[in-house]
């Protein structure tokens, strides 16, 4: 199983692709999205996958009271399944405390409410998410 971490659709030697959660806000800064290889162990087997890191610029103003939506696309060969959940981790502060962590299951839409208590804020945080796969 091989992954191409240069795109959001990770190529696999057995065909098909692995879709990762995509934030509608991230499309404003596609150059700030970086994919890197990562590995995880399931039992005695070591698997490889990709992790997506999104670096939001300080200058990006966003309404704090909105809800960020993450849609997942989990198309894959039938001999593969996803280990849930796909995990999105926020680090940093929005001026009213840490955002914390949100977990979203594959094949579904997850929502993370920001709610800063003010009309606008300048988020300076890193969003990191990964979707892992394994055999049946």
UniProtKB/Swiss-Prot annotation:
User: Has the keyword ATP-binding been applied to this entry?
Assistant: no
Family matches, as Pfam families: PMG
InterPro entries per the UniProt record, alphabetical: KRTAP_PMG
The entry's keywords: Keratin
* Gene Ontology cellular-component annotations: cytosol; intermediate filament
Q: What this chain does, per the record? A: In the hair cortex, hair keratin intermediate filaments are embedded in an interfilamentous matrix, consisting of hair keratin-associated proteins (KRTAP), which are essential for the formation of a rigid and resistant hair shaft through their extensive disulfide bond cross-linking with abundant cysteine residues of hair keratins. The matrix proteins include the high-sulfur and high-glycine-tyrosine keratins.
The family annotation for this protein states: Belongs to the PMG family.
Q: How does it assemble?
A: Interacts with hair keratins.
The identity of this protein, by name, is: Keratin-associated protein 15-1
Give the species this sequence originates from.
Answer: Capra hircus (Goat)
